[in-house]
Structure formats: C-alpha cells, structure tokens
C-alpha cells in the first residue's frame, strides 16, 4: 500500500497571509527542490533540517519568488521519507505557481491526509496518533487540544498496548492447553485466567466510560435554550456570549426563529441555540418559530429549560417541560432578583440552577453545572497521563473486545473446550488491534484519512 512517488500540496490554508508553505514528500523530493531552488550562497549539498534563503524559478528560469527552503531527509521527517518545504510569500497565486512547477516536473498532487497516511504506513505513528493530528487541528478549546496532545504523545496507544499484551498472554496459556491436551487446565488455573480477564474487563470499562466526555470535548456540545416567552432566554444567550446577539424586549414572542452561535465556556466548546418562546399561538409566524424550536429539541445534547423564578409555573411552562421531558435537561430558574418562589413539584428530580441574567448573577454556576454534567474527566487538562476516548471507532472496538472477553470467561465457567476460549481471545486481540491500526481494514483507513485536509 506504500507508494514511493513524490507528492506535493500546500501546507497552509488558502488565501492571503504572511507566509505560504508548499510541502513535498517522496524519493524525488530533494531532486525536485534542487532543480528549481538556488540558495543565495553556493553550497555543494544542502544540510538536512536547515533553512536556506534563495530564489525559486520555473522551468524557463523565470523567478517565481524569493523563498526559504528546507529538506528533512528520511527517516527524520514527518513521513519518514525525504520531505521538502518551500516557504514563500503568502498568497494563493504564488503557492499555486510553485505547486504547478513541481507538478509539471513529475510530482503528484497529494490526496487529503496522504502525508499523515505515509507517516502511519511507514511506522512513524500509529492510527490513534494519526487521528489525534486532525483532532488537534480541529480542537476548539484548551481541554480538547490537551486531550488530542495526550493521544498524539501515545498515551492511548500505550494503554491499548497493555490491553493487547494481557490478552496475548491469556491466549498463550489457552493455546498451550490446546497443544498439550494431556495437561488439562487445572481449576486453579481456570480461576486465575477468569480473574485476569475480569480485571481486564474492569480496566476497559473505565476507559469506555470516558467516551461521552471525550466526544463532547472533540465535537462540542449542542445546547438549546428553551422555554415559554419572556422568561429571559435571549438575555441568557447574550449573557453567555458576552454580547447583545439576540434582540431583547418586554414583548412576548420577540424571538421567532432560532439563533445559533459558537463559544467556549469553562473549556467546553458549545453551540448555543436560542429559540422562540413555547406557547399556543394563532400567529402563523410565531407558530412556525415554535415548531422550529420543538424540532431542535431532538438534536440537542442539553436543553436549558428557562423558568421565570418570580412567577408560579403556568400552562406554557408545563407545555415546554413536556416537549423536553425525555431529553437531557438543566432547569434555569431565572429572574431570581425579583422573587424566589419554592421549586414547583413539576420539576421534581430535575437538576436546576438559579440565575438573574440581567444582574449577571448565577452564570458561573450555570457553566459549572454544564461542565460537571458532561465532562467528568476535565482533569485531563492538568494530567496528560489520563486516557480519554474521543472517537466512536475506539469505543466500538473496546466494547467488542470486552464482549469477547466476557464470552471467554463464560467458556471457563461452562468447562468448554479451550478451543472455544481461544476463538474469543483472538477476536478480542483483533478488536484492540483495530484501534492502533494493526488489524484495521483498508476501508476504515480510507474513511479516517479522507477527513484530513490536503497538505496534512
């Protein structure tokens, strides 16, 4: 699957900028560099990992740009191939011109993620580290980048390696019983094997349980502000954003469509959605706003049900509560500066916070409540040793391995032939191997690397 042809792509985002970078990788990268780049000071051979200033010309000898160039000879490069970078003046035209020169000379335009794919295929990184690269690029908060860096440093791969080694040790003992049937596995040995598998299952469960927190850090949290009209929903959105994004008036029904904004609160990337007030109405425009608000409930990770704390809950409050009854709900009892009434029995069992958005009171408590609800592993920011799952693929593979280990324990309990146990252990070993890329099918690899941008 490894292709040694020379690939080229822009390594910087399109558009104007101070610097544009063109990257090459492959056996012909250095030859192509020397064909079109002339260092200002003559040298017989460019040293690896040194920047050289000079001129870049096309095939006719016309100067394209004054550039800085560097060659990183294998294996001390990102791909473990010869890698060349041209640092030119920023701007799409210059970057495209340099790429066109290399393409005309025999290089090939890189596919999305192909540089990282080559790093994986050449053994520089495993699949979890490759996935961490794109997570790091796309991270929207410090917590998310810390988790991605931990994975890029190999923390997840190390943990998966431990799991794989324990499974391999169990398999070796079971296969010994198959190869030497005259030496039956004694009861004590069976109990030891079962206990080892049980301990491994418990360790896997602890890692699996981190997925929801990791998913939120990686993908962000979709938070819906919901409730009847004039309870302070738009004021709450403006308070969280720190700016007057939504129109606020004393007239019920001012918000008639959804308003969405991205922000980071307490290390959490959020997509905040303000909605029309929920009530029965004859106004067709407002009615459409209510319908859209209801439709957003199903896709929300969290519904902030806003209640006017200075009034008793009414029919419209109960209607809004019913619409989000089966979702993750955090009740925001607003306007507590006006009055503090007892909590309605309709809210029994639901978590709540008290706020006065206009007085800017209670917002920190709201953010903390959201964080505690969804990120149980927030300490990863301070401790890179913590392993947190961020990919559904990783969770699915660990669940599959865990299930195989459970069936292996059952073969011991039932006194079944060791061949049955060996099958389950091999399945478990294959499952954990999928995470790091040891046993990953090509179609999964393709899906992973096509998520990358060209040039990475």
Curated annotation (Swiss-Prot):
The UniProt gene name for this protein comes to mnmE
The primary site where this protein sits is: cytoplasm
Name the top EC class.
Answer: hydrolase
Q: Record's family?
A: Belongs to the TRAFAC class TrmE-Era-EngA-EngB-Septin-like GTPase superfamily. TrmE GTPase family.
Q: What Gene3D superfamilies does the record point to? A: P-loop containing nucleotide triphosphate hydrolases (3.40.50.300), Probable tRNA modification gtpase trme, domain 1 (3.30.1360.120), tRNA modification GTPase MnmE domain 2 (1.20.120.430)
| Intrachain S-S bonds | none
Give binding positions for GTP.
230-235, 249-255, 274-277
Which residues does the record give as K(+) binding sites? 230, 249, 251, 254
Keyword GTP-binding in the entry? The reply is yes
Q: Which residues form the TrmE-type G domain?
A: 220-375
What is this protein called in UniProt? Answer: tRNA modification GTPase MnmE
EC code: 3.6.-.-
Cofactor binding note from Swiss-Prot or TrEMBL: Binds 1 potassium ion per subunit.
Give coiled-coil spans as residue ranges. Answer: none
SUPFAM superfamilies per record: P-loop containing nucleoside triphosphate hydrolases, TrmE connector domain
Q: Which organism is it from?
A: Syntrophotalea carbinolica (strain DSM 2380 / NBRC 103641 / GraBd1)
Q: Name one GO cellular component term.
A: cytosol
């Amino acid at each position: 699957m490894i292709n040694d042809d020379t690939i080229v792509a822009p390594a910087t985002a399109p558009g104007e900028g101070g610097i544009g970078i063109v990257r090459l990788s492959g056996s012909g990268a250095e030859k192509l560099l020397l064909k079109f780049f002339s260092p200002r000071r003559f040298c017989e051979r460019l040293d690896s990992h040194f920047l050289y200033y000079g001129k870049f010309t096309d095939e006719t000898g016309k100067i394209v740009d004054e550039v800085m160039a560097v060659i990183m000879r294998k294996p001390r490069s990102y791909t473990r191939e010869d890698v060349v970078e041209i640092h030119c003046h920023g701007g799409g035209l210059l970057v495209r011109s340099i790429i066109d020169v290399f393409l005309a000379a025999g290089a090939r335009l890189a596919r999305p993620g192909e540089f990282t794919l080559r790093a994986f295929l050449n053994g520089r990184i495993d699949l979890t580290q490759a996935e961490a690269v794109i997570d790091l690029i796309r991270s929207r908060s410090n917590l998310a980048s810390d988790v991605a860096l931990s994975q890029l440093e190999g923390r997840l791969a190390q943990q998966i390696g431990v799991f794989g080694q324990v499974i391999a040790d169990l398999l070796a003992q079971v296969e010994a019983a198959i190869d030497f049937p005259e030496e039956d596995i004694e009861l004590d040995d069976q109990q030891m094997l079962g206990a080892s598998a049980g301990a491994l299952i418990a360790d896997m469960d602890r890692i699996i349980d981190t997925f929801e927190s990791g998913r939120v850090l990686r993908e962000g949290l979709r938070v819906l502000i919901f409730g009847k009209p004039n309870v302070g929903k738009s004021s709450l959105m403006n308070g969280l954003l720190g700016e007057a994004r939504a129109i606020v008036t004393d007239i019920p029904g001012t918000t008639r469509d959804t308003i969405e904004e991205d922000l980071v609160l307490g290390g959490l990337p959020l997509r905040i959605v303000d909605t029309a007030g929920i009530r029965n109405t004859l106004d067709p425009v407002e009615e459409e706003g209510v319908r859209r608000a209801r439709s957003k409930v199903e896709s929300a990770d969290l519904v902030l049900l806003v209640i006017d704390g200075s009034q008793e809950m009414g029919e419209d409050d109960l209607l809004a509560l019913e619409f989000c009854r089966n979702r993750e709900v955090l009740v925001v009892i607003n306007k507590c500066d006006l009055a503090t009434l007892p909590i309605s029995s309709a809210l029994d069992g639901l978590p709540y916070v008290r706020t006065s958005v206009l007085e800017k009171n209670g917002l920190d408590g709201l953010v903390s409540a959201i964080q505690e609800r969804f990120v149980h592993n927030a300490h990863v920011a301070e401790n890179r040793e913590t392993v947190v799952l961020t990919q559904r693929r990783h969770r699915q593979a660990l669940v599959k391995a865990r299930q195989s280990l459970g069936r292996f324990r059952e073969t011991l309990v039932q006194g079944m032939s060791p061949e049955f146990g060996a099958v389950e252990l091999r399945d478990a070993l294959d499952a954990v191997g999928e995470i790091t890329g040891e046993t990953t099918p090509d179609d999964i690899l393709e899906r992973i690397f096509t998520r990358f941008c060209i040039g990475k």
